[in-house]
Regions:
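C-terminal segment of classical bacterial N-terminal signal peptides
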Residues: 15-27
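Signal peptide-proximal N-terminal region
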Residues: 30, 54-76, 169-172, 199-202
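Beta-alpha junction/loop-to-helix N-cap segments that form part of ligand/metal-binding clefts
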Residues: 32-34, 47-54, 66-140, 149, ...
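Short glycine-centered, acidic/aromatic-flanked micro-motifs in structured strand/loop junctions
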Residues: 39, 78-81, 179-182
Length: 252
């Protein structure tokens, strides 16, 4: 199911790129469109970034093998960010003025998305974020150059609450739900949505940040043992995930 979701995201992103290509006259002159690939093959999240980067390259190669988009072939170049916002902005600045124009940016990072979303309108650069990024950018009236696809972090957080609501037969009044989250722009994204849902549904929201990379969580799970929430939502990434599972087992 995960593979299908990724494949669908790639297909939609490529279709979106097709609508962002130059006019037919310009296409006739230039039968190539450049696509920057911001990747993180190194750094603490490399286990996530490497297959993602490989998959994007494979998909673009497949598109080209089938004739491109309306006959326009996709050229691409990787720029390593190591999931670092500063490096990501450097990649954006270097690639945005690539000769022939840039199709769109898929930053593969929430922090980088935050940083370049302010720059995108002035640069007339499109920011495509399949399933991640800046949740507020779903409002296209404000974020005209952001294209979130397949939902966002608020969508995911709301799905979690809906699932718990089903288990609790439609009422969360008086319940206590803990959010253990990666202390980064990515990890903080679901908080506004969960706070709204807590106010609406009448449950208490405990917010427990975990400092990156997430290998030290004993104090966090001590709070879980003390507070005894009814549910724990884990918003993790990289090495934080297996560490959380081990600590949860020790806490149970």
């Amino acid at each position: 199911m995960k593979f299908k979701s990724i494949a669908m995201a790639a297909a939609i992103a490529t279709a979106s790129l097709g609508t962002l290509l130059a006019s037919p006259a310009a296409q006739a002159q230039a039968q190539e469109q450049f696509m920057p690939l911001l990747v993180y093959r190194t750094g603490q999240f490399a286990p996530l970034g490497i297959p993602w980067a490989n998959g994007k390259q494979d998909y673009l190669k497949l598109v080209n093998a089938k004739g491109g988009i309306n006959g326009v072939k996709i050229t691409f170049e990787e720029c390593e960010t190591a999931y670092d916002t500063g490096k990501g902005v450097e990649c954006y600045e270097r690639m945005k003025s690539r000769t022939g124009g840039t199709g769109s940016f898929d930053t593969q990072s929430t922090g980088i998305t935050f940083a370049v979303s302010d720059k995108a309108p002035g640069d007339k650069a499109t920011i495509v974020t399949p399933g991640y990024g800046l949740s507020q950018s779903a409002d296209g009236r404000v974020f005209e150059w952001n294209f979130p696809l397949l939902g966002n972090y608020w969508t995911a957080a709301d799905s979690m609450i809906q699932d718990i609501l089903k288990k609790e037969k439609g009422s969360l009044k008086g319940k206590k739900i803990a959010l253990i989250y990666h202390d980064s722009p990515y990890g903080k994204e679901p908080i506004p949505l969960l706070e709204k849902r807590a106010a609406k549904e009448g449950f208490e929201l405990l917010k427990l940040p975990v400092t990156a990379p997430g290998v030290e969580q004993k104090s966090t799970w001590l709070q879980i043992r003390q507070q005894r929430p009814d549910y724990v939502l884990l918003w993790s990434a990289g090495v934080m995930t297996p560490t959380s599972i081990r600590e949860a087992q020790a806490t149970a």
